[in-house]
């Protein structure tokens, strides 16, 4: 499909720079097939679900993946900004760096020159390899948990570019950009649909008889990358690591067999569930990378409903929701959201989507 079909105009005033408080007070647009759009709030979620339905959340935790440092060892020391995007082993990360032209294989970057100090000593990284799009492989001077601690001390929260271009990250983002489920470190972007949940909402869902299950997909920086191809068939999707335990898979399969619906909280949860689904719709245990790219025409096997934020024009995530509900339906839903002042992107409002081939 032509990627221009997934484009739309978004006024800058619709882009949220801070979340609402409390989190479950965010607006939520309910999109059902052949039913008028409905404006609700996230706190209404229990009333929109049925006993036996099963929510699936992503429990990944965002690391302090934004590092600032300087190249050392060969004359002038230019400032280097690095965003960690994929862990390769105990000491090596793949990263996006700016300005990439200032680095060559063999160069050493010392991070912490913005005033942050690593108590364990200098956090140095050697450039092992360099790609064509600003990607480098960094071999750090620390390893394993020691490296994790050093990154936490020196790094900053990696806000999405559409927020970071308008304001600098601050202490409030450390809390705001983590979900209440965040427990497994490894993401460089938050699974933002989960940001809407509160302890009170979780209690109300349990009282309604709705189950809640945790899976892990470590969200990569590729989630922010624009689709530059003119046709969806030409786009290469980024890979991310995910896990679904055997116990979770069994519980979801049993609930669905009993008539419960699987409700993915966020596109990351949906992509992982669909990656683990068999042709018969049963979910298998999973521990691997996934680069699944969902566009209109995809046959959903595991997920019946999707709670998700509002996404960028011409993005893989808008393509995904268009596959879930239909392109015309989602273009109309987004036009309504823009016209009525919904807040977009990571800190924005939510939508609750019913799959277009299932009668609500």
Swiss-Prot record:
Transmembrane segments: none annotated. Keywords: Cytoplasm, Queuosine biosynthesis, S-adenosyl-L-methionine, Transferase. It holds the Pfam family Queuosine_synth. Pathway: tRNA modification; tRNA-queuosine biosynthesis. It is found in: Cytoplasm. It is an enzyme of class 2 (transferase). GO terms for cellular component: cytoplasm. Monomer. GO terms for biological process: queuosine biosynthetic process; tRNA wobble guanine modification. Coiled coil: none annotated. This is S-adenosylmethionine:tRNA ribosyltransferase-isomerase. It catalyses: 7-aminomethyl-7-carbaguanosine(34) in tRNA + S-adenosyl-L-methionine = epoxyqueuosine(34) in tRNA + adenine + L-methionine + 2 H(+).
């Amino acid at each position: 499909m032509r990627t221009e079909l997934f484009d739309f105009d978004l006024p800058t005033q619709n882009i949220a720079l801070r979340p609402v408080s409390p989190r479950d007070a965010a607006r939520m647009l309910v999109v059902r097939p052949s039913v008028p759009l409905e404006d609700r709030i996230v706190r209404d979620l229990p009333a929109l679900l049925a006993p036996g339905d099963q929510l699936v959340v992503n429990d990944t935790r965002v690391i302090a993946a934004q590092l600032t440092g300087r190249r050392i060892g060969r004359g002038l020391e230019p400032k280097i900004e690095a965003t960690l995007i994929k862990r390769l082993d105990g000491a090596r990360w793949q990263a996006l760096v700016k300005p990439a032209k200032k680095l060559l294989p063999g160069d050493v970057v010392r991070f912490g020159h913005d005033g942050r100090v690593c108590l364990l000593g200098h956090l140095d990284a050697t450039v092992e390899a360099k790609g064509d799009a600003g990607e480098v492989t960094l071999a750090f001077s620390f390893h394993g948990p020691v490296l994790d601690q050093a990154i936490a001390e020196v790094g900053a929260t990696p806000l999405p570019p559409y927020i970071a271009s308008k304001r600098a990250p601050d202490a409030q983002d450390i809390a705001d950009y983590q979900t209440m489920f965040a427990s497994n470190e490894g993401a460089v972007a938050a699974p933002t649909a989960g940001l809407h949940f509160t302890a009170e909402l979780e209690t109300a869902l349990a009282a309604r008889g709705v189950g809640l299950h945790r899976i892990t997909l470590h969200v990569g920086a590729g989630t922010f990358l624009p689709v530059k191809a003119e046709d969806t068939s030409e786009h290469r999707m980024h890979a991310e690591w995910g896990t679904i335990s055997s116990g979770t898979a069994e519980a979801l399969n049993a609930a669905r067999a009993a008539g419960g619906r699987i409700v993915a909280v966020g596109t990351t949860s949906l992509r992982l569930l669909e990656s683990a689904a068999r042709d018969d719709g049963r979910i298998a245990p999973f521990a691997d990378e996934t680069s699944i790219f969902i566009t209109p025409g995809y046959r959903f096997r595991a997920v019946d409903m999707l709670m998700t934020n509002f996404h960028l024009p011409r993005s893989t995530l808008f393509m995904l929701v268009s596959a879930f509900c239909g392109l015309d339906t989602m273009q109309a839903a987004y036009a309504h959201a823009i016209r009525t002042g919904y807040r977009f992107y990571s800190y924005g409002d939510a939508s609750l989507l019913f799959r277009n081939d299932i009668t609500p």
